[in-house]
Amino acid sequence: MKLFHRHLVARGICPSESGPNPPSQPALVTAFCDWFRTHRGVKEPTLRQYARGATDLLRTLGEDVDQWKAQAVRDFLLKRASQCGTPTTQALITSLRAFLRFLNFRGEFRGDLALAIPAVAHWRLSRLPRCLSADEVNRLVAACDGTDLRRLRDRAIILTLVRLGLRSGDVAGLRLTDINWNSGTLQVIGKGRYQVRLPLPQDVGDALLRYLECRPANIDTDHVFVRSNAPCRPFASGDGVSSVVKHALKRANIDAPAKGAHLLRHTAATEMLRNGVPLDQAGLVLRHRSINMTAYYAKADVTLLKQIAQPWPEVNA
C-alpha cells in the first residue's frame, strides 16, 4: 500500500502524507552541496554524507560561523569520533574538511579552520581485501536462478558487479543507452563524472538480455535496473543494489566478510590479479586514480605471496 500511495502522489492523483515537515537543511549546507555538485561533479550519495556532517556541525556550533573557534571544531569532531568506528570517523573528517574549505572559499571567516581537523590513525592498505572465493561466486550466481523478473534482475546485477567490478551507484545509474549491443560494450559514468567504456563479458550480456526481455516495457524510466514491485521505479541509490547482494548472499547461505555490493567489487579486482591481469590494466577497469589502490588487492593472492616469501633465517642461541 505504501508503494501504491507513493505512486499516486508522484502522479499527482492524491496529496502527500500529512504530518510534520522534516527539518529544513541550512542554507549554507544547500549552497555547499550545490557548489560541489556543479564544480566537482560529486554524486548524490557523497553529497548526502557531506550534508549530514555539515548540518550536524552547524547545529552544534551555531550558524554564526565567523564566531567559530578551532578548538570548538576539534572538540566537536573528537566527541563524534568517540561514538563511532574508524571508517565513520574518516568519512566525517572528509565531510568537515570539505565544508570548512568551502566556507573559507566564500570568505565566511578568516583563516582555514579545516587545519583544525585532526587526522585519524590509519595505516593505508593495512587490511586484506574482503572477497569471495570462486566457489562462493558460483553459489551466489546460482542463488539467482529462476525465470521471474526479480531473479532475472538479481542475476544480471550480481554478474555485472562481480565481472566488471562496478560500484553499486554505477549499477543503479545504468541507462538503456549505456549498453552498446553492436560493439559489446558498456558505458559507465563513475566518480567525478569520469566516463569509461568497458567490454561486456558474454555471461553478463546474456543475463542483461534475459532480464531486459522480461523488464516491463511501459515503465516511465530508461534506467536498466528497476524495483520488481509496481510501480517498478529505479533504485534511488546504490543502497538498493547492495540490498540485492545482501539477500542473494543469504539465499546462497554464504557467510561473507561483508554484505554489500562492494564485496563483489573487491572480488572482481582480486580475481583479475589472480588471473595475471597487470596492475595498470586492472586499475583502468576499476577506474582507480592511483595504482596503489589496485595494488591493495594483490595481497589477497596468498598462493602467489607464498612463492615470493623468503625463508625466515635461523638464529643460533
Regions found by a protein language model. Give the residues of each.
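Conserved catalytic core of the tyrosine transesterase superfamily
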Residues: 1-317
